Amino acid sequence: MDAWPDGGYTPFRGAKGTTFEGGVRVPGIAYWKGMINPGRVSDDVFDLMDLFGTSLRLAGISQDLLPDDRYYDFIDQSSFLIHDNGKGNRESVYFWWGTELMGIRMREYKEHIKVIVPQAPHMWIDYATIQDVGLAPWLFNLYIDPKEEMPVGHRRNAWLASLGAQLKTHAATFKKYPPKNIGL
């Protein structure tokens, strides 16, 4: 799964259908003549869901016009796109596999609470096996270990409490706004 022909040889672990970096990280290219300076490169996080809110802002449409019967999980990233030294406004991104919350990334740290088992029989996206990682979450520093091979450990790690709190806050949004069955 982490090698050719499924995932290729990349600096990241996993492939499409997993929540490891190789399955979720994709390059993004933004072009807007006269607004976004060409040649700028950034390593900041820009989630796909941010496109909606960012597009609203850039089009001058107020978020107040949106229906209030749903939760909007986006962060306005317009300043990140149009300023030369713009920094990403997203501190964390959550990883889901269907209806299963799998983990979180906050800056350079990533915590897995569940993983997709690549050795599972019938390892296709529809038949993958999800497994809890154990008593303690797997915590990786992606700047040091982009392949997510060596957990940094969970004892006395200052990031673990922050990541756990973020996961709980994110999960709480589903109480007020439960997922809707849209028939897919």
For each of these PLM feature ranges, what is it?
Residues 51, 112-115, 119-121, 128-138, ...:
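Long, internal low-complexity/basic segments
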Residues 28-30:
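Short glycine- and hydrophobic/aromatic-rich loop-to-beta-strand nucleating segment
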Residues 25:
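Conserved nucleotide-sugar donor-binding catalytic segment
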Residues 1-21, 36-138, 142:
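C-terminal cap/loop subdomain of S1 sulfatases and analogous C-terminal strand-loop tails that border
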